[in-house]
């Protein structure tokens, strides 16, 4: 009686849902508007936070590029492992609606914790790291947990006779994802770089706005609560699949010697599970085997937000007319291009290839997508080869780098013991030709450097440390009767935001305070040298210099992306003479050269990712599609694990690493093509013709019970 009552209640709720209002006189239920807005805000929240994450690790937490890349991909991988947990909770316990709400709350808490961790005044660096990691963990649980629920929940809102509307809904849903991605990757880098807070880039705001968007997403979703169809949990098919496989393995292990041999190892589950379920799992396993090479594609694809962003920081970002793009904004190209490429491929390229009588099967498209992604990394390699020409690499063990500034009134000669580093005389106030390598006998070495000037030799005892860069300043004594050696440690690592570095040498007899933009530095009198300051790229025509008695206005000109400048300030009558020298070359490779690699990678994504999902769904029974979705998400997760391992373990130059990934993907695409050649397409819908459902839950009819196998399924061509 109780069960009958429950059924009546469920039926009543269902009828009520059926009568829910439609959107603007269409067959679309009003409820999907809340779901689409929720998805837009959630994707804005996720991609906005992720866009600035690598630079946050490097500039705020002060991690090196390899650790930053590793943690970035560890987080990305975790975001694709947690959907399994979300699907399990939704299907077995809470249902999709409650799962989305509860995990969205976890998501919001993660964003808030992450934003608080980006406030400099909250604790020390250990607290910032702890809050950041806790926040990212909660975000990964939230975004991954709701990932398998939201789209499926949206599909549940449609009646069975509104198939076209449901299909169009998924297109709208996908558009909302890309719209959120594009806008967030434009806006959050602006919040990071153009808004200053706590004396630097405003990461707290860049993370806080995505947090606010996630709060809006949650509020919008809850607001539509009374309009949704809410299906109760039906049990997780992935759990049943795992139990069936586990039973087959254990039963085979226990009884293989006692019982007759069976045609397939899964047939050992027949004692407990239906023939139909076993047959469906066999079909799924055939597809999952093809998934084995796929993580390598995602290993390349997900480096847009890590290695490619770091490459962009070392490039010229000026498009002219005052339009300067930020390195973390380049990721928006992927979302923009995919919106352009999908119709181009569907309505242009694929039909044209068909006219050439070339049959593009899904597996051929996926293999082609892999090759395109490999070409993207070949393009990235070519760009990197030119980019590194503007970079001064830190010296290896038992080596230092040194450059010399001759601030004397005539030529000088510098001699290092046993090393002919500077063979030619150095002219006064001449710009150094660059850093020279100085071999050392150990981790550090005291060297007697001989400086020759006007026929006199002066000996300087200087200590050099391995892996460090130095500037040796040679200037006259206060009485101008000799030479003084001043060895200064140099900062040679380029800014990860593309900013310029500048320092000042004061040859004036008075102390000087210099203001460049919002930065102020002090240079002591008589050849004092200021600290390095970082300033945004731009024209600085009115820098202010204040001495003990006067105030001067100097023209520093353009301080370009990634350059290191040394400016010598000298007294010249009633003015200050300015000599600007470029210690490290500006970023002269334009960021536009990254566009080809984004084009190749996005084209590869269209052919690989979209086609891969289409292929997977076409080759599995309806009841097993969630299992394949879980398997697909796992390939993304393992792809990020590959990058994590390479970033932390390989220790190779960046262009070599790019080339390695390209070569690995080419090799994997060949393996995948061979596997695809031997794969035979089947029609899962034919299962309904081979099986007759009865009260037992899918037993095969007796005439086919013994001989049914995948061989009975209708086949199509290979590859």
From Swiss-Prot:
Pfam (any one): PTR2
For molecular function, the Gene Ontology terms on record are: dipeptide transmembrane transporter activity; peptide:proton symporter activity; tripeptide transmembrane transporter activity
Biological process (GO) annotations held by this record are: dipeptide import across plasma membrane; innate immune response; peptidoglycan transport; protein transport; regulation of nucleotide-binding domain, leucine rich repeat containing receptor signaling pathway; response to yeast; tripeptide import across plasma membrane
UniProt-annotated glycosylation sites, renumbered to this chain: 66, 481, 513, 532
Q: Where is this region: Extracellular domain (ECD)?
A: 389-594
Instruction: List residues in topological domain: Cytoplasmic.
Output: 1-43, 91-99, 147-169, 223-280, 356-367, 616-626, 679-719
Q: Which UniProt keywords apply?
A: Cell membrane, Cytoplasmic vesicle, Glycoprotein, Immunity, Innate immunity, Membrane, Peptide transport, Protein transport, Symport, Transmembrane, Transmembrane helix, Transport
Q: Where are the transmembrane segments?
A: 44-61, 70-90, 100-120, 126-146, 170-190, 202-222, 281-301, 335-355, 368-388, 595-615, 627-647, 658-678
The UniProt catalytic activity note for this protein reads:
a dipeptide(out) + 2 H(+)(out) = a dipeptide(in) + 2 H(+)(in); N-acetyl-D-muramoyl-L-alanyl-D-isoglutamine(out) + 3 H(+)(out) = N-acetyl-D-muramoyl-L-alanyl-D-isoglutamine(in) + 3 H(+)(in); glycyl-L-leucine(out) + 2 H(+)(out) = glycyl-L-leucine(in) + 2 H(+)(in); glycyl-L-lysine(out) + 2 H(+)(out) = glycyl-L-lysine(in) + 2 H(+)(in)
Q: Which residues lie on this side of the membrane: Extracellular?
A: 62-69, 121-125, 191-201, 302-334, 389-594, 648-657
> How does this protein's activity depend on the pH of its environment?
Optimum pH is 7.5.
Enumerate the InterPro entries for this protein: MFS_trans_sf, POT_fam, PTR2_symporter_CS
Disordered: annotated segments: 695-719
Cellular component, GO annotation: apical plasma membrane; phagocytic vesicle membrane; plasma membrane
The UniProt regions of compositional bias labelled Basic and acidic residues, in chain numbering, are: 695-708
This protein's membrane topology, according to the annotation, is:
Multi-pass membrane protein
Q: Subcellular localization, per the record? A: Apical cell membrane; Cytoplasmic vesicle, Phagosome membrane; Cell membrane
Domain of life of the source:
Eukaryota
Q: In which tissues is it expressed?
A: Expressed in kidney, brain and gut. Also expressed weakly in eye, gill and skeletal muscle.
Q: Which family does it belong to?
A: Belongs to the major facilitator superfamily. Proton-dependent oligopeptide transporter (POT/PTR) (TC 2.A.17) family.
- What does this protein's UniProt record list under function? Proton-coupled amino-acid transporter that transports oligopeptides of 2 to 4 amino acids with a preference for dipeptides. Transports neutral and anionic dipeptides with a proton to peptide stoichiometry of 2:1 or 3:1.
What protein am I looking at? Solute carrier family 15 member 2
Source species, please?
Answer: Danio rerio (Zebrafish)
Organism ancestry = Eukaryota, Metazoa, Chordata, Craniata, Vertebrata
């Amino acid at each position: 009686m109780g069960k009958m009552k429950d059924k009546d209640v469920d039926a009543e709720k269902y009828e009520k849902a059926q009568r829910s209002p439609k959107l603007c006189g269409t067959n679309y239920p009003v409820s999907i508007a809340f779901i689409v807005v929720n998805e837009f805000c959630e994707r804005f929240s996720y991609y906005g936070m992720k866009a600035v994450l690598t630079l946050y690790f490097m500039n705020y937490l002060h991690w090196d590029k390899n650790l930053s890349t590793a943690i970035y991909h560890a987080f990305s991988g975790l975001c694709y492992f947690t959907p399994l947990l979300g699907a399990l909770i939704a299907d077995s316990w809470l249902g999709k609606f409650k799962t989305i709400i509860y995990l969205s709350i976890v998501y919001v808490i993660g964003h808030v914790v992450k934003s608080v961790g980006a406030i400099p005044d909250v604790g020390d660096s250990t607290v910032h790291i702890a809050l950041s990691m806790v926040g990212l963990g909660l975000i990964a649980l939230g975004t991954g947990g709701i990932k398998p629920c939201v789209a499926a929940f949206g599909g549940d809102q449609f009646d069975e006779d509104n198939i076209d509307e449901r299909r169009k809904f998924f297109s709208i849903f996908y558009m909302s994802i890309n719209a959120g991605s594009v806008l967030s990757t434009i806006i959050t880098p602006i919040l990071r770089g153009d808004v200053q807070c706590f004396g630097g880039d405003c990461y707290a705001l860049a993370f806080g706005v995505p947090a606010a968007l996630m709060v809006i997403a949650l509020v919008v979703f809850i607001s539509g609560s009374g309009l949704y169809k809410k299906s109760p949990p039906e049990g997780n098919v992935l759990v049943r699949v795992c139990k069936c496989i586990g039973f087959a393995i254990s039963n085979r292990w226990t009884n293989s010697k006692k019982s007759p041999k069976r045609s397939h190892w899964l047939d050992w589950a027949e004692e407990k599970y239906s023939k139909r379920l076993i047959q469906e799992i066999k079909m799924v396993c055939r597809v999952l085997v093809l998934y084995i090479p796929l993580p390598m594609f995602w290993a390349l694809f997900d480096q847009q937000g890590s290695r490619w962003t770091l490459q962009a920081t070392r490039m010229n970002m000026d498009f002219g007319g005052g339009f300067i793009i930020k390195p973390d904004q380049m990721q928006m190209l992927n979302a923009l291009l995919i919106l352009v490429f999908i119709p181009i491929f569907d309505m242009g390229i694929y039909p044209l290839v068909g006219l050439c009588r070339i049959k593009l099967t899904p597996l051929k498209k996926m293999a082609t997508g892999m090759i395109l992604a490999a070409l993207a990394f070949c393009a990235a390699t070519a760009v990197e080869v030119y980019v590194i020409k503007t970079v001064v690499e830190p010296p290896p063990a038992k080596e230092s780098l040194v450059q010399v500034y001759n601030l004397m009134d005539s030529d000088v000669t510098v001699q290092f013991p046993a090393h002919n580093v500077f063979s030619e005389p150095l002219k006064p106030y001449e710009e150094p030709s660059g850093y020279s390598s100085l071999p050392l006998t150990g981790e550090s070495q005291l060297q007697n450097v001989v400086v020759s000037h006007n026929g006199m030799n002066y000996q300087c005892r200087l200590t050099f440390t391995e892996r460090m860069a130095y500037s040796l300043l040679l200037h006259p004594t206060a009485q101008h009767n000799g030479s003084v050696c001043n060895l200064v440690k140099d900062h040679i690592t380029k800014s990860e935001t593309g900013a310029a570095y500048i320092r000042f040498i004061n040859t004036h007899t008075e102390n000087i305070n210099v203001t460049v933009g919002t930065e102020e530095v002090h240079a002591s009198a008589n050849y004092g040298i200021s600290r390095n300051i970082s300033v945004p790229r731009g024209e600085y025509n009115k820098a202010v210099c204040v001495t003990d008695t006067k105030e001067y206005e100097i023209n520093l000109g353009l301080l370009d992306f990634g350059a290191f400048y040394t400016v010598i300030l000298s007294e010249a009558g009633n003015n200050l003479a300015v000599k600007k020298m470029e210690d490290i070359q500006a970023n002269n490779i334009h960021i536009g050269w990254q566009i080809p690699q984004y084009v190749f990678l996005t084209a590869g994504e269209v052919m690989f990712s979209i086609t891969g999902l289409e292929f997977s769904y076409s080759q599995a029974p309806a009841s097993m599609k969630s299992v394949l979705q879980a398997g697909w998400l796992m390939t993304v997760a393992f792809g990020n694990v590959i990058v994590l391992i390479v970033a932390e373990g390989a220790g190779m130059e960046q262009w070599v690493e790019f080339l390695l990934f390209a070569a690995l993907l080419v090799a994997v695409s060949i393996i995948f093509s061979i596997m695809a050649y031997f794969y035979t397409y089947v029609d899962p819908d034919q299962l309904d013709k081979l099986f007759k459902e009865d009260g037992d839950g899918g037993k095969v009819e007796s005439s086919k019970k013994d001989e049914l196998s995948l061989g009975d399924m209708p086949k199509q061509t290979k590859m």
